Structure formats: structure tokens, C-alpha cells
């Protein structure tokens, strides 16, 4: 019953291919064929690090997809934020529809870490809101990495934070085969060891029910399929996957593996062993505190830790159990925690997207976490072992990283140094588009000049991005443009990820024409409708006006045939000069290629879809943190029901009705009423 920890023995889903199959109507063009060949050759030659310098709109994601198909290795793609991760996830899913493309980001919609402020003697308890849909996708990602070779996981910096040890995760899994003799009580006990809960009334994710000799299990990593185990006289007679909502049989299986409900599941023996080592550490720490005459801290630590120990001994769990992860994983003091990188096979491929942002992020995570926890330990809120519940240090991440490709339009000094000159360029776009024309205009008349440019673009049906230096200036400019009849929105840091995506989508749909922001309009987001980027106060040297920032911001207009960037400045800074020189170099190469091959540039046409689809869940379905409304909606969806086919409408109606009844059952009547109104709109549209 207990499986060995050799991942090679894991069952594979025989209905799926084990090889990457790229599906795309396009063929590599422009600089792409040479870039793909070079990246693949370097990877197969064993080169540890290389860089792909790709301008905006050059098809970096498509190039990487071709590399993945040719090298045929499990792949981890890291992005700097959830928005870009969701966009990449959608793109890779469309490129590899027959393979296992997964999404691994933080499952917290809201997270307030445990903290202590000595100056005011204030202790802040941990509070969080967990997105169950993303939790399910994280579990699916680790299962895929352990069981399939055709796995591609898109992740954020969450990948360097602690997970349960893969050895425990593997040793606990339950492998079932038809004909196997198994005691029903033993089977139920094993499911509870995996932290599944028994629920005879409703089969929910991470639960099971028993009806005679039939057990139904809803795997924690699945959102659409549940497993039915039919026993006869102690033998497994049949294994069936079925729809947990309708009960419809999907397919019969010869073999199935049930994985733990959480990454932090561990054996009873390991938990009891951890309790003993925690007691030893507590004794040593109390002696230190008493010797320093810190009586209040000692009493506080003893009380909090004893309560946690009692909970762990009785139920195998306690709030904040992650602070004891070093004891639960059997690691030595100072050893790095297990992370997603421990689930990767040694021959995997790592792709760091927007590496000039992601690499510094990885380096910064450890220090911020350490500072907060040192205060908790010093004042007796946590044992010193809590310091080992942490993200990887940068050098630890480097040691665990497999062969890597850094992807960026503006690679940083680290990537260039690590690549040792192996930089592959993607400068020529398949569409023939050339980099935007860059103009410099005086600051004194920047607002009036900008308004006239905006009116010109609106006449053409295009969109405009404006980037300012301060929040106050962005607010004032938005108000001023609005007073002059321009449809404008302001994108600021208080807007959460999902609503940001909705705002950018509304810009592309033409619900407004101008988007004003500060530092939120740089990397990665595809907006082909944008033909003008205006950078105010471009001559104020600093982080927001560095060479890399300017190149990235100018690149937002690179997907449009009429693309233009205006830098408002009274003097030429070094950053401006470097950005303009690089832009001119790229334009020269692009124009030369187009003339040589007789290519006429054309704007990118990209369907306007919800890039968070599949990587989001209605806010009302999320677990709520203390004092946080469960039914808060971050952005209301406005689908075009008229464009839907009758079969799609029927499916949508069924889905909405299920959600409405669930909200009513949970006494969330406002959310239920909103969905009822959506159902009415959909029925009206279908009859029209």
C-alpha cells in the first residue's frame, strides 16, 4: 500500500502522450528559426545558462514552446507576477493542448504574516484568504511533475518558498490496482492519513464517502473528476472516474494513484518524532531566555509552544505548523527547505521570463522574511527553528536550478554574466513590425501636446498609454483628461491582480481610450491596439526612467503598425540616450531584414480573451480571512452572450445555476442574486 519514493515507479496516464506536441497554425519566422536552433544546440551540449534577448512582439513564448518540443524535457517557467504567469499559462496551454500544462502561484488572495512591533508592543496574528481553485492547481502541478515527462509548469517566485518534502508526499500516496486485495478499514485509514475528510452528505474536493463496499474519493488536485472504488470481498473489483456533480461515468481504469490532500501531509510517526525534537529545542531555548532574565518572553514561548505540541500530538496539526517545518522534514538547522525545485527531475529545463525583474525578486525574498521572523524569535513568539521556514536564499536557488534560459528584452548584468556571452537575439518580428519611432519633446508643453496626440489616436481608433513619475501626477492628469472629454482610466498599485487584468482588457475592447499609470505598464502585457506611449518627465534619471525601464515602456507600442513613443524631456540623460540607441539599432536591423525579404509590416491581431481564465475563481468561492467579506467581487465580467452557440449557452446556464444554488446554500444571497440576474440575461440573449 505505501509506495516507494522512486518517482520512476509512478503510474502514467496511458491515455495521454508522454511527449510534447506543439500545436500552432504558424511556423517559425524572422529570427525565430535561428534562435530555436541555437538554444536547443546549447541545451543539448550541456550549457548551464543562456539568454534569449527578445524584443516586444518577437514571439518569445512561441520560440520557447518550440525549444520545449525539441528538447522534450519537463519544464518550469518562472514569471515575475501572477498576471504574467496567467498570460503565459494560457499561451502554453494553447500551444500544448495534449500535454500537462500547470499553474503554480501563491494560493493566498490576502496574506497578513505573523509579526511583532516592539516599539508599540503590538503582536499581529497571521490572517489569510486562500483561493481553493489555485490550491487545487498547485497540487495538480506537483503531481504532474512527479508522474509525467510532458509537464510544463508556469510559476511565480512562490516556487522558492517551502513545500512539504517530496519524499513524504511520495511515500504517503495510495496506489490502487484492480484485483488488489485491500481491507476497507485500512483503505479508509490511509485516506485519513492523506488528510482526506469523510463526508457522507456532499462529495467535495479532498473528501470521500463510503456506501457499502463502494468508496467515492474526490482527489484534492482535481476539479472535474472523482474516483469510485468498488470492492468485492476485500478485492478491488472496479476503478472508475466519474463526474462528481452529475455522477456520469467518464472512464474505467486499471490503476490509479491518490496523492495527499496537502503538500504538508506527513506520517504519524514523523509527527510524533517532530514533537520530541520540538520539546528538546523548547527546553534549550527556555534556558537561554531565563539566563538572559527574559521571563516574559520565556513564559510566552512556553505557553504558545506547549499548546501547539498538544494539538500536534492529538490531531496531527496546529495553526502555524509551517513554523515547525524543519522538525517535520528532519532537516538540520540552516538547511534549505524543500521547494517546488525539489519536485523537478534533474534533467529539467528552467525558463526565467522577464528575467531582469524575476532574478532580483528571487534575491530579495529571503532578507525580508528573515527580518520579520528574527523579531518573533527574539521576543518569545517563536522557536529559533521558525527561521528555517523560509524561501530559498539566492545561492541555494542557484544550486538547485537546472539548465536555464533567461528571457528578456532588457537582460540584466547577472543574466549576461552567467550566460558568458551566449546571448541569442530575437530582434526581427515575424509580422515585419519595426520598433516604434521615438520622439523627444519639451516638458513645458507636455500635457497640451499629449492631449492633441491623444485626439489624433482616438480618431484612428487606437489606444494610448501614459506613464508618469508620481501617483499625484497620475491622478491629476487622469482628472484633467477626463474633464476634457477623453475616456481615461488610472491604473494604480491599490488595484489587485484580477481587476488590473479586467482594466487592460477593457482598454483593448475600447471601453476607454487612455490608460495612465506609473510603473505598471512595462513588462509583458500584450496590447496590440496601443499605438502611442507617452513618457512624461523622461529626463528624471532614476529607477522608473532607467535604460531598461524606458526600453520596456517604449516596447508597449511595438505591436502596432503606427507605433510611436514620445519622451517628454528638456535634457538628454544617459539612460535616454542608451534606450534610443538600442531602439535605433533594432529598427535598422528590422528594416534591413524586411527589405531583403520583401516583407510588408502588419499590425498584430490578437484575440481579446480573459487571460486569467482557468487561473481564477469567483471571489465568493474563496475561503475568507478574518473580517473579510466572502462575497466581495473584484471585477464584474461582461461576456458577449450573443456570440455564443446554443450548446455553449446550455453549458453556461448549467454552470451558473450550480453556482447560484451553492451561494444560496452558503447563505450568500447577494452573490446568488447577481448570478440569477446573469442567468436571466443569458436566457434573454438566447431567445433574441
Curated annotation (Swiss-Prot):
<dbReference type="GO" id="GO:0006289">
    <property type="term" value="P:nucleotide-excision repair"/>
</dbReference>
<feature type="short sequence motif" description="Beta-hairpin">
    <location>
        <begin position="107"/>
        <end position="130"/>
    </location>
</feature>
<dbReference type="Pfam" id="PF04851">
    <property type="entry name" value="ResIII"/>
</dbReference>
<dbReference type="Pfam" id="PF00271">
    <property type="entry name" value="Helicase_C"/>
</dbReference>
<keyword id="KW-0742">SOS response</keyword>
<dbReference type="Pfam" id="PF12344">
    <property type="entry name" value="UvrB"/>
</dbReference>
<protein>
    <recommendedName>
        <fullName>UvrABC system protein B</fullName>
    </recommendedName>
</protein>
<comment type="function">
    <text>The UvrABC repair system catalyzes the recognition and processing of DNA lesions. A damage recognition complex composed of 2 UvrA and 2 UvrB subunits scans DNA for abnormalities. Upon binding of the UvrA(2)B(2) complex to a putative damaged site, the DNA wraps around one UvrB monomer. DNA wrap is dependent on ATP binding by UvrB and probably causes local melting of the DNA helix, facilitating insertion of UvrB beta-hairpin between the DNA strands. Then UvrB probes one DNA strand for the presence of a lesion.</text>
</comment>
<dbReference type="GO" id="GO:0005524">
    <property type="term" value="F:ATP binding"/>
</dbReference>
<keyword id="KW-0267">Excision nuclease</keyword>
<dbReference type="Pfam" id="PF17757">
    <property type="entry name" value="UvrB_inter"/>
</dbReference>
<feature type="binding site">
    <location>
        <begin position="54"/>
        <end position="61"/>
    </location>
    <ligand>
        <name>ATP</name>
    </ligand>
</feature>
<keyword id="KW-0963">Cytoplasm</keyword>
<dbReference type="GO" id="GO:0009381">
    <property type="term" value="F:excinuclease ABC activity"/>
</dbReference>
<dbReference type="GO" id="GO:0016887">
    <property type="term" value="F:ATP hydrolysis activity"/>
</dbReference>
<dbReference type="InterPro" id="IPR036876">
    <property type="entry name" value="UVR_dom_sf"/>
</dbReference>
<dbReference type="GO" id="GO:0003677">
    <property type="term" value="F:DNA binding"/>
</dbReference>
<dbReference type="GO" id="GO:0009432">
    <property type="term" value="P:SOS response"/>
</dbReference>
<keyword id="KW-0067">ATP-binding</keyword>
<dbReference type="InterPro" id="IPR024759">
    <property type="entry name" value="UvrB_YAD/RRR_dom"/>
</dbReference>
<dbReference type="InterPro" id="IPR027417">
    <property type="entry name" value="P-loop_NTPase"/>
</dbReference>
<dbReference type="GO" id="GO:0009380">
    <property type="term" value="C:excinuclease repair complex"/>
</dbReference>
<feature type="domain" description="Helicase ATP-binding">
    <location>
        <begin position="41"/>
        <end position="429"/>
    </location>
</feature>
<dbReference type="InterPro" id="IPR041471">
    <property type="entry name" value="UvrB_inter"/>
</dbReference>
<keyword id="KW-0228">DNA excision</keyword>
<dbReference type="InterPro" id="IPR014001">
    <property type="entry name" value="Helicase_ATP-bd"/>
</dbReference>
<dbReference type="Pfam" id="PF02151">
    <property type="entry name" value="UVR"/>
</dbReference>
<dbReference type="InterPro" id="IPR001943">
    <property type="entry name" value="UVR_dom"/>
</dbReference>
<dbReference type="InterPro" id="IPR004807">
    <property type="entry name" value="UvrB"/>
</dbReference>
<feature type="compositionally biased region" description="Basic and acidic residues">
    <location>
        <begin position="633"/>
        <end position="645"/>
    </location>
</feature>
<comment type="similarity">
    <text>Belongs to the UvrB family.</text>
</comment>
<dbReference type="GO" id="GO:0005737">
    <property type="term" value="C:cytoplasm"/>
</dbReference>
<dbReference type="InterPro" id="IPR006935">
    <property type="entry name" value="Helicase/UvrB_N"/>
</dbReference>
<keyword id="KW-0547">Nucleotide-binding</keyword>
<dbReference type="InterPro" id="IPR001650">
    <property type="entry name" value="Helicase_C-like"/>
</dbReference>
<comment type="subunit">
    <text>Forms a heterotetramer with UvrA during the search for lesions. Interacts with UvrC in an incision complex.</text>
</comment>
<feature type="region of interest" description="Disordered">
    <location>
        <begin position="616"/>
        <end position="646"/>
    </location>
</feature>
<keyword id="KW-0227">DNA damage</keyword>
<feature type="domain" description="Helicase C-terminal">
    <location>
        <begin position="446"/>
        <end position="612"/>
    </location>
</feature>
<keyword id="KW-0234">DNA repair</keyword>
<feature type="domain" description="UVR">
    <location>
        <begin position="650"/>
        <end position="685"/>
    </location>
</feature>
Amino acid at each position: 500500500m505505501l509506495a516507494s519514493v522512486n518517482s520512476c515507479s509512478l503510474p502514467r496516464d496511458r491515455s495521454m502522450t508522454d511527449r510534447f506536441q506543439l500545436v500552432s497554425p504558424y511556423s517559425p519566422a524572422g529570427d525565430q528559426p535561428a534562435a530555436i536552433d541555437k538554444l536547443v544546440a546549447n541545451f543539448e551540449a550541456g550549457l548551464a545558462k543562456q539568454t534569449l534577448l527578445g524584443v516586444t512582439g518577437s514571439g518569445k513564448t512561441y520560440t520557447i514552446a518550440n525549444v520545449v518540443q525539441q528538447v522534450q524535457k519537463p519544464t518550469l517557467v518562472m514569471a515575475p507576477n501572477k498576471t504574467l504567469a496567467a498570460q503565459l499559462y494560457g499561451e502554453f496551454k494553447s500551444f500544448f493542448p495534449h500535454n500537462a500544462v500547470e499553474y503554480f502561484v501563491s494560493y493566498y488572495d490576502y496574506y497578513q504574516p505573523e509579526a511583532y512591533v516592539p516599539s508599540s508592543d503590538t503582536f499581529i496574528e497571521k490572517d489569510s484568504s486562500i483561493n481553493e481553485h489555485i490550491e487545487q492547481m498547485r497540487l495538480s502541478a506537483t503531481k504532474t511533475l512527479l508522474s509525467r515527462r510532458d509537464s510544463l509548469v508556469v510559476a511565480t517566485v512562490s516556487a522558492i518558498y517551502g513545500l512539504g518534502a517530496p519524499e513524504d508526499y511520495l511515500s504517503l500516496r495510495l496506489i490502487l490496482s484492480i484485483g488488489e486485495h485491500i481491507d476497507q478499514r485500512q483503505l479508509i485509514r490511509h485516506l485519513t492519513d492523506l488528510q482526506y475528510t469523510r463526508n457522507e452528505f456532499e462529495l467535495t474536493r479532498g473528501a470521500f464517502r463510503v456506501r457499502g463496499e463502494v468508496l467515492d474519493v474526490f482527489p484534492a488536485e482535481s476539479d472535474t473528476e472523482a474516483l469510485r472504488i468498488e470492492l468485492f470481498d476485500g478485492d478491488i473489483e472496479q476503478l472508475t472516474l466519474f463526474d462528481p456533480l452529475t455522477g456520469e461515468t467518464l472512464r474505467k481504469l486499471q490503476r490509479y494513484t491518490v496523492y495527499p490532500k496537502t503538500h504538508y501531509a506527513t506520517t504519524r510517526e514523523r509527527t510524533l518524532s517532530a514533537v520530541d525534537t520540538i520539546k528538546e529545542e523548547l527546553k534549550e531555548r527556555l534556558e537561554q531566555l531565563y539566563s538572559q532574565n527574559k521571563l516574559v518572553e520565556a513564559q510566552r514561548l512556553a505557553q504558545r509552544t506547549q499548546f501547539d505540541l498538544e494539538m500536534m500530538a492529538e490531531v496531527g496539526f496546529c495553526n502555524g505548523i509551517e513554523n515547525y517545518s524543519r522538525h517535520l522534514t528532519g532537516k538540520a538547522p540552516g538547511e534549505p527547505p524543500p521547494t517546488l525545485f525539489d519536485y523537478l527531475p534533474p534533467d529539467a529545463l528552467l525558463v526565467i521570463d522577464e528575467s531582469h525583474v524575476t532574478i532580483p525578486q528571487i534575491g530579495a525574498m529571503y532578507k525580508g522574511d528573515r527580518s520579520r521572523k528574527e523579531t518573533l524569535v527574539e521576543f518569545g513568539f517563536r522557536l529559533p527553528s521558525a527561521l528555517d521556514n523560509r524561501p530559498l536564499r539566492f545561492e541555494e536557488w542557484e544550486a538547485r536550478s537546472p539548465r536555464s534560459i533567461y528571457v528578456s528584452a532588457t537582460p540584466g548584468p547577472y543574466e549576461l554574466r552567467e550566460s558568458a556571452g551566449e546571448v541569442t537575439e530575437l530582434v526581427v518580428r515575424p509580422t515585419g513590425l519595426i520598433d516604434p519611432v521615438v520622439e523627444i519633446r519639451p516638458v513645458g508643453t507636455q500635457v497640451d501636446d499629449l492631449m492633441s496626440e491623444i485626439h489624433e489616436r482616438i480618431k484612428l481608433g487606437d489606444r494610448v498609454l501614459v506613464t508618469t513619475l508620481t501617483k499625484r501626477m497620475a491622478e491629476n492628469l487622469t482628472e484633467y483628461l477626463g474633464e476634457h472629454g477623453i475616456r481615461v482610466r488610472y491604473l494604480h498599485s491599490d488595484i489587485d491582480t484580477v481587476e488590473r487584468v479586467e482594466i487592460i482588457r477593457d482598454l483593448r475592447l475600447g471601453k476607454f481610450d487612455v490608460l495612465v499609470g506609473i510603473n505598471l505598464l512595462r513588462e509583458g502585457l500584450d496590447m496590440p491596439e496601443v499605438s502611442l506611449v507617452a513618457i512624461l518627465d523622461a529626463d528624471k534619471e532614476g529607477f522608473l526612467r532607467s535604460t531598461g525601464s524606458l526600453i520596456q515602456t517604449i516596447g508597449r507600442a511595438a505591436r502596432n503598425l503606427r507605433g510611436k513613443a514620445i519622451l517628454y524631456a528638456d535634457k538628454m540623460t544617459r539612460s535616454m540616450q542608451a534606450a534610443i540607441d538600442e531602439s535605433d539599432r533594432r529598427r535598422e536591423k528590422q528594416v534591413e531584414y524586411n527589405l531583403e525579404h520583401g516583407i510588408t509590416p502588419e499590425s498584430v491581431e490578437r484575440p481579446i480573451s480573459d487571460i486569467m481564465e482557468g487561473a481564477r475563481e469567483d471571489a465568493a468561492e474563496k475561503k475568507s480571512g478574518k473580517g473579510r467579506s466572502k462575497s466581495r467581487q473584484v471585477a464584474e465580467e461582461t461576456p458577449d452572450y450573443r456570440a455564443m452557440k446554443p450548446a455553449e449557452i446550455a453549458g453556461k446556464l448549467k454552470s451558473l445555476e450550480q453556482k447560484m444554488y451553492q451561494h444560496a446554500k452558503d447563505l450568500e444571497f447577494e452573490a446568488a442574486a447577481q448570478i440569477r440576474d446573469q442567468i436571466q440575461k443569458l436566457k434573454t440573449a438566447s431567445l433574441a
